[in-house]
């Protein structure tokens, strides 16, 4: 949702605001090559990098309040020098609210706890505690890796307790009661607090939110064990969302870095994050991210399951995977990528590909299928998996394990065979009232992008589409945030509901904090461009505000309205750093004499002097007379020249 107001206008919703940020403070982590945003550092556990806090430059926190004053939806309000404000969708959570003291050791406030408890259809499972860092055993969650630590060990001394030392008991559905999923509620005609929150946030009627979820065209990922998250919806009828991937690897990164990446990604606009950790301390890293995440968190459980069996795909089993999924459900993972469509008979279809199987999860399960010459255990146990997801309201993100990894492989037989199977599994999940979205490619040339969306809608019954890019060319390592943002904008316009970001490090290495920002900004541009093309209500208000500021040479407002205010200001100040340049009617591109907008103002002033409006029509009777007199003058010139249409060229 984007709205524009002025100081004299009245609003139908109450709003509470905090002070705008006017200074540029140092960020939590050093970034020598990129100017940081106006952020400060929060208090953190000993030895842990502080996370970024504070409002974006020129912005302040505001809240939309509906009929129920207890329901407050956070937004970002950009304050302009004219006294107007522009209110935009905000994913940053409490980290940009100067009135909140952030301590990552305690996690974020569990805002949804009371909503969940009041429904009375879930209860704490006293047999379980969260999290554990040692080997798994009855009643204890953990990575299950021998030697990975014991309760109380690890870099931050956690194990079997919540981040602030309290034992946390996970919730699950009360047996015998109706479905506790947002899909179940929506189908029964019940409007939840989460749906009300989304309606305010998107600027849509709450009945639209309920109906889209009930039809399976949208998902509202909201695990009952992640009460810290701020509800959001993913679907064609809503703003296009973006996801940012995080997570360590066996080679690099740490828990501290991944928590800061999560905060940094949501600061710049990530609607969800996925923890794709494959290195050490997978469970502990995930716990820290979830407890501090204001957005839904997704995972790929097969990664942790593989770690439990020593990294050997052939040693995997349904039992190991099932226990891993339950552990992650109890921690609060909101959606999980499940590669249940990688069937044994589809694996040979990839043999003639230029780049084979490029999905990590897809390759792991293909390897298992070939090692045992059995059908994928995620496919054969899918109904049981649905029952587990339904107990916690976890959303399926049905993985495209056979997605194309190169332009040459786009829309091939393997990709489309798996897509048809995902459509089959979608209906199975819906029978269990489990929410579903479908993952898509990948690497797709522009001429095949719309076809991908049409096939997905047809084969997967209009379930929301969630795509990685797609990259529209393979020739630009180091710039794949650009090659993929092109495809992302196009596929978002065609109907994709969420775009998984790609960073400049794609295909090259693990992204750092700067890469995360570059990827998020690129994808926010793509998503917003798609919203504009779709004609989403209110999407253009932000563009119009910036266009006005640009035409009126309000430089400070241009900076503040930018997706990245600090970079916009830094680029301007590289050549015109003086304070006087902030009121100049030109920039260093055209200089004082060739600025098209300055000349346009002069043309308007001249037209206005003749009583004309900017379009050249009479703004008043005197203006009409000026137009008539001008036409008569030109007619007289034509007659004086002998009524000739073509005149000889004059010699110089």
Curated annotation (Swiss-Prot):
Indicate yes or no for the key word Signal: no
Q: Which biological process annotations from GO are given for this protein?
A: thiamine biosynthetic process; thiamine diphosphate biosynthetic process
Residues bound to Zn(2+) = 443, 507
**Residues annotated for [4Fe-4S] cluster binding in this entry:** 587, 590, 595
Instruction: Provide this UniProt record's keywords sorted from A to Z.
Output: 4Fe-4S, Iron, Iron-sulfur, Lyase, Metal-binding, S-adenosyl-L-methionine, Thiamine biosynthesis, Zinc
One Pfam match, given by its short name, reads ThiC_Rad_SAM
**Protein's name in the database:** Phosphomethylpyrimidine synthase
Q: Which residue windows does the record flag with biased composition (Gly residues)?
A: 134-162
Where are the annotated segments for Disordered?
A: 1-45, 118-166
Q: What does this protein do?
A: Catalyzes the synthesis of the hydroxymethylpyrimidine phosphate (HMP-P) moiety of thiamine from aminoimidazole ribotide (AIR) in a radical S-adenosyl-L-methionine (SAM)-dependent reaction.
Question: Which EC class does it fall in?
Answer: lyase
Ranges annotated as biased composition (Low complexity) = 8-45
Give the residue range of the signal peptide.
none
Q: How is the cofactor bound?
A: Binds 1 [4Fe-4S] cluster per subunit. The cluster is coordinated with 3 cysteines and an exchangeable S-adenosyl-L-methionine.
Q: In which pathway does it act?
A: Cofactor biosynthesis; thiamine diphosphate biosynthesis
The set of disulfide-linked cysteines is none
Q: Write down the chemical reaction(s) this protein catalyses.
A: 5-amino-1-(5-phospho-beta-D-ribosyl)imidazole + S-adenosyl-L-methionine = 4-amino-2-methyl-5-(phosphooxymethyl)pyrimidine + CO + 5'-deoxyadenosine + formate + L-methionine + 3 H(+)
Cofactor field = [4Fe-4S] cluster
A single GO cellular-component term on record: cytosol
